[in-house]
Amino acid sequence: YADAIFTNSYRKVLGQLSARKLLQDIMNRQQGERNQEQGAKVRL
């Protein structure tokens, strides 16, 4: 019983961690694109 609870919460935490990492990756990618756009405007 305790094992089942532990496994369940462990899975939940893992899911939250991977979701958070995914969000950070997306945010970083958007930030990079924005920076590239600004750099292109500066060059023009």
From Swiss-Prot:
Descriptive protein name: Somatoliberin
Molecular function terms from GO: growth hormone-releasing hormone activity; growth hormone-releasing hormone receptor binding; neuropeptide hormone activity; peptide hormone receptor binding
Residues recorded as bearing Leucine amide in the entry: 44
GO cellular component, one term: extracellular space
The organism's taxonomic lineage, starting at the top: Eukaryota, Metazoa, Chordata, Craniata, Vertebrata
Alphabetical list of Pfam families matching this protein: Hormone_2
Record carries keyword Flavoprotein: no
GO terms for biological process, alphabetical: adenylate cyclase-activating G protein-coupled receptor signaling pathway; growth hormone secretion; regulation of protein localization
PROSITE patterns in the record: GLUCAGON (PS00260)
Primary localisation category: secreted
The entry's keywords: Amidation, Secreted
Family listed: Belongs to the glucagon family.
The organism's place on the tree of life at top rank: Eukaryota
Subcellular location: Secreted
Described purpose of this protein according to its UniProt entry: GRF is released by the hypothalamus and acts on the adenohypophyse to stimulate the secretion of growth hormone.
Membrane-crossing segments per the record: none
Classification via InterPro entries: Glucagon_GIP_secretin_VIP, VIP/GHRH-like
